[in-house]
Amino acid sequence: MTTTLMIQGTTSDAGKTTLVAALCRILARKGIKVAPFKPQNMALNSAVTEDGGEIGRGQAVQAQAAGIAPHTDMNPILLKPSTDTGAQVIVHGKALSAMEADAYHDYKKVAMQAVLESYRRLQTQYQVIVVEGAGSPAEINLREGDIANMGFAEEVDCPVIIIADIDKGGVFAHLVGTLELLSASEQKRVVGFVINRFRGDIELLKPGLTWLEQKTNKPVLGVIPYIQKLHLEAEDALTANSTAENTQHLKIRVPVWQRISNHTDFDPLRLHPQVDFAFVGPGQSLEGADLIILPGTKNTIADLNFMRSQGWDTQLAKHLRYGGKVLGICGGLQMLGTALHDPHGIESPASSVNGLGYLDFETTFTQHKTLLNLQGELHINDKPVAISGYEIHAGLSTGPAFQRPIIYCEGQPEGCRSADDQIIATYWHGLFSQPSATQALLAWAGLTNARALDYSALIETELTRLADEVEQCMDIDALFPTFAS
């Protein structure tokens, strides 16, 4: 019989994703077959699975922690916001349709069936399923038809741990308030609390823990310390910028679109010792960069208009006049062409708009969505290097610019470059995950003697470090008595 434990949080970014990853790694190295599961995820950072679908990147990292390949059953419902009130709905890894919030609310009963189908399939394959909730279970306006938090826990009858982030303050109010807002049956299934990101002397916290346990009649199952410089992929929030400590560095700037997607593409750059990396927000300038990267977006036309409203198109033109380099990824590639056509109204009311015009091709948005994991060779310097990545897009780009490709995948060309070699563009995400490719791209951008950073190995090290910390401060055998050592 499969053991299921659900992690819910008092807020978004309380530490749910991280704790699930830690538990998956701890159990996996005990020889237990464990899988992560998130019924519903709302995120613009996604991953392509081996079965050809799309899930949240958080679940992909959790699968890595568990030592298994990511699968669409680990995140059966993925919502990718495209406007303030609407999102693309991904079911079992495939795009279903764009829905407004009220339409999705009506769809939840159907969505719950998809969630349960995936969960039951995982039950047949794994000894333990560690489930991650979404946001907070105490959102009163979202309680009806809930499939992401207590609605799921009640349906499958699983115990729940509630985690809260003490570093942000108000941890006792968050925990007590969340518990108070749950129904009686939901309160009963809460087996305890975890306090995350604690700094300082634990002795000073103990009176508060005693009060919390007496107030709620729930145990504190662990206090996870603030883990300095823990580098795992961020699912939602943009992570902090970095500044290179090396005297020789490359200044890379990335404009933050309103619907920026897959910003985890840049995590390896943030950690590279020779890169001065920064996201550039509204009202900030792109000037002074060596390399400007135009990232992916869930709404290319809207974010192209946003780019122009910020004056970034003018700054990009100046950057190129002075010899700067530009890389366009996915939606960023589409912006660099001469025109974008949306005849089916996929991103916006049916229309055509002018692109930035730096590369000779046009993009037409189609109802078919490309989802691919890829390996190939990057051809931007004298010597081709191995590269891996993935595609997630709903556009078809064609034109003379693609006669100058930058990647070959199984003999097929991909991407394009300008005649003067200042601009390159590709649909591939994950360009910087492979050390040789990162080294080549930084060299193309002007960094001599660029070092190789093995990002995949770094994530493995970080997952192990995280698991070690969590295992020291939580009684894992008590949580999973069936598998106690």
Curated annotation (Swiss-Prot):
The keyword Repeat does not apply. GO terms for molecular function: ABC-type vitamin B12 transporter activity; catalytic activity. Pathway: Cofactor biosynthesis; adenosylcobalamin biosynthesis. GO terms for biological process: cobalamin biosynthetic process. PROSITE patterns: GATASE_COBBQ. It comes from the Bacteria. Transmembrane segments: none annotated. Keywords: Cobalamin biosynthesis, Glutamine amidotransferase. Residues 249-437 form the GATase cobBQ-type domain. InterPro entries: Class_I_gatase-like (IPR029062), CobQ/CobB/MinD/ParA_Nub-bd_dom (IPR002586), CobQ_GATase1 (IPR033949), CobQ_N (IPR047045), CobQ_synth (IPR004459), GATase_3 (IPR011698), P-loop_NTPase (IPR027417). The keyword Cell division does not apply. The active site is at 330 (nucleophile), 429. Belongs to the CobB/CobQ family. CobQ subfamily. Catalyzes amidations at positions B, D, E, and G on adenosylcobyrinic A,C-diamide. NH(2) groups are provided by glutamine, and one molecule of ATP is hydrogenolyzed for each amidation. NCBIfam families: cobQ (TIGR00313), PRK00784.1 (NF001989). This is Cobyric acid synthase.
